[in-house]
Curated annotation (Swiss-Prot):
It catalyses: L-homoserine + acetyl-CoA = O-acetyl-L-homoserine + CoA. Residues 375-432, 436-492 form the CBS domain. It is an enzyme of class 2 (transferase). Keywords: Acyltransferase, Amino-acid biosynthesis, CBS domain, Cytoplasm, Methionine biosynthesis, Repeat, Transferase. It comes from Methanosalsum zhilinae (strain DSM 4017 / NBRC 107636 / OCM 62 / WeN5). Substrate binds at residues 221, 349. Disulfide bonds: none annotated. This is Homoserine O-acetyltransferase.
């Protein structure tokens, strides 16, 4: 086993018990979701990272399948000691619905007919993919995820997750993505679809008992693959080098290495992918649009997750300006967002190739855990005029040991603890001021949890009120939450 490798992994399958309702209003029954999971789910189930794959990806994101000659598609990032560290995190990746790598799609058997769906399969959207993933996580008993990450179409899913389930995710990492599909992106997808449906073997999608439209699918892949590269990468890799010859043939056969490469990519793709799935998934990408009434700011207004938006300098399919548009909209909504550009000549595919930069940027973002990541938001507070008896009752009813005392405008005035209440009972104190700690040690939401932990340890206290810049109480953080998180995310 190579250093940092997961070794042999297996794909698992979850069968939904209920129908899956789609954005179009239609429903799919007997839905299967193929997925893989790496690492160990901790006792509190708060170390989950969901990985979302790109257009033609699958659930096999890392490790090796028996007999394979290469690992999963994001093995450079997933495994022990990598940024998606399986010694810290429980990583889940599933094949999208509409796909052909284990999850229900047009090549699956329609339970009503006993035959492959073909074009009777309903059109799906990125939102439908995300909703299916949510069903899987519910099945796994996961009530929240630490982070969701993906590149290209995976990045679209990340953004959709952030909008659809804002209270469910803590951090969101979108690579080489956009908040809506541009006319150019839609145009490339349409040309690819025409390549498929123009193949006589396509037969209106009814080819499952004959031959797949391999010529059309290969051509679609060739078109797509050009958009994944960059001019620089093609010049570096191929230049104008000839393939197996030292002079032009002066005919219409392949002369150049780049031609041979594209044909190879097209042929090999037909061995692992279904033509109808390509039609459906590219259509889902075309429909993707998170703007609301034309406004991206309005469309992203509900996002609560801390966001990392990553672009690639040489990506012309999802150019950096589209990522910057996302960042500006998030900033306008006061979302905590970080923007990074990967310096690379690989083009769009850099999110699959630039191991060093990606591990550094993503690892730094995931390990930069602050108080706001784990503090309790629904903090119970009281004012100074409350009686000790009432304060004790509130603490008992809510199962808490620390009770911040605030002014009329919610500013911190002090704090009392269960130990203070015990002291008041023993000494027969009747007013809160006899036990109130007024010089309160507090924390800020952007404070690192290790600094917060040292503050608690140095002062021998087990919880801190969290205040904003106006000294208003916005949460509380306890040593138990910190100990759990530090244990799961120890710095490397």
């Amino acid at each position: 086993m190579k250093k940092g490798s997961l070794g042999i992994v297996e794909t698992k399958y979850y069968h939904l018990e209920e129908e899956l309702k789609l954005e179009s209003g239609r429903k799919i029954s007997d839905v299967t979701i193929a997925y893989e999971a790496y690492g160990t789910l901790n006792r509190d189930k708060n170390n989950v990272i969901l990985v979302c794959h790109a257009l033609t990806g699958d659930a096999h994101a890392a490790g090796w399948h028996k007999g394979d000659n290469k690992p999963g598609w994001w093995d450079i990032l997933i495994g022990p000691g990598k940024c998606l560290d399986t010694d810290k995190y429980f990583i889940v990746c599933s094949n999208v619905i509409g796909g052909c790598r284990g999850s229900t799609g047009p090549s699956s058997i329609d339970p009503e007919t006993g035959k492959p769906y073909g074009l009777s399969f309903p059109v799906i959207t990125i939102k439908d993919m995300v909703n299916a993933q949510k069903k899987l996580l519910d099945h796994l008993g996961i009530s929240s995820i630490y982070a969701v990450i993906g590149g290209s179409m995976g990045g679209l899913q990340v953004l959709q997750w952030s909008v659809s389930y804002p209270d469910y995710i803590n951090k969101a990492i979108a690579l080489a993505a956009s908040a809506y599909s541009s006319p150019q992106q839609i145009a490339f997808n349409e040309v690819a679809r025409i390549a498929i449906i123009s193949d006589p073997e396509w037969n209106k999608g009814n080819y499952y008992y004959s031959r797949q439209p391999s010529h059309g699918l290969a051509l679609a892949r060739m078109i797509g693959h050009i958009t994944y590269l960059s001019d620089e990468s093609m010049r570096e890799k191929f230049g104008r080098e000839l393939q197996d010859r030292d002079r032009y043939n002066y005919d219409l056969s392949m002369d150049f290495q780049v031609e041979s490469y594209l044909h190879y990519k097209g042929r090999s793709f037909t061995e692992r992918f279904d033509a109808n799935s390509y039609l459906y998934i590219t259509k889902a990408v075309d429909y993707f649009d998170l703007t609301e009434n034309g406004s991206l700011i309005d469309g992203l207004k509900d996002i609560k997750a801390k966001c990392l938006i990553i672009a690639v300098t040489s990506d012309w399919l999802y150019p950096p300006y589209q990522s910057k548009d996302i960042v500006m909209a998030l900033n306008a909504n006061n979302v905590d967002v970080t923007y990074r550009e990967i310096e690379s000549n690989y083009g769009h595919d850099a999110f699959l190739l630039e191991a060093g930069q990606l591990n550094y940027v993503i690892g730094g973002f995931l390990n930069n855990i602050t108080v706001s990541d784990i503090m309790k938001l629904d903090v119970v507070t009281v004012q100074e005029d409350i009686s000790i008896e009432d304060a004790a009752q509130i603490m008992f009813d809510n199962g808490i040991t620390h009770l911040p005392v605030v002014s009329d405008d919610e500013q911190i005035r002090g704090i009392i603890t269960s130990w203070d209440i015990s002291k008041a009972v023993a000494l027969k104190f009747t007013t809160l001021d006899r036990i109130l700690t007024k010089n309160v040690i507090t924390s800020r939401p952007d404070e690192g949890i290790e600094k917060c932990a040292r503050k608690m340890q140095n002062n021998n206290i087990s919880a801190l009120p969290v205040i904003d810049e106006n000294r208003k109480v916005i949460g509380i953080i306890g040593s138990d939450e910190i100990n759990k998180m530090i244990g799961n995310h120890r710095c490397t």
